[in-house]
Amino acid sequence: IKELVQKALDGGAAPDDILDHGLMKGMGVVGKRFGDGDMFIPEVMLSARTMHAALELLRPILEGQKKKLQMKGKIVLGTVAGDIHDIGKSLVEMMFVAGGFEVIDLGINVAPQAFVEAVNKHEPDVVGMSALLTSTMPAMAETIEAIDNAGLRKDFRLKIIVGGAPITADYAEQIGADLYGENAIEAVEVVKKALAK
């Protein structure tokens, strides 16, 4: 992809046009095909990695032209305490980056207090939590409680989204999450809609 992006730049294409009319449109097609069941997680991950590689080339050019990438929002992301699974969270991270978000990845096995500290430090629009094991689901509730106890949602600006194999929309509501993403593509769309309100 870097060669194709460089070829487009050398041919006179504007970096923001490459991003908006090429890369973002392509990721939109990926999202639709995944949602329709015509594309599967390995292809989505490959597409997201490709987008990420293209952004690595375009970002310094855009910033050099004082056209800083217009981010759609900032998200702090992590797998909750006790859970060491990375693939789902990594896919979600790549899809958010591809969707135009700044992502602060806290990694795996993230304690509730680490989420609180990251929210204080980075002032994100959204906190995203992932869990793959049913045994770590309570850690989501504990993390949301810690964020609320720290007063970080009192102005209703900060949104919390949860997801992962054992998580359901009902569970998300039960533990006080604002949003639920059934998969990586849906998570990005749900967050975009929530932030547009």
Language-model segment annotations:
Residues 68, 88-90, 97:
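Cytosolic, long alpha-helical scaffolding segments
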Residues 31, 74-79, 129-130:
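Short, hydrophobic beta-strand segments
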Residues 92-99, 104-177, 190-192:
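Cofactor-cradling patches in redox/metallo enzymes
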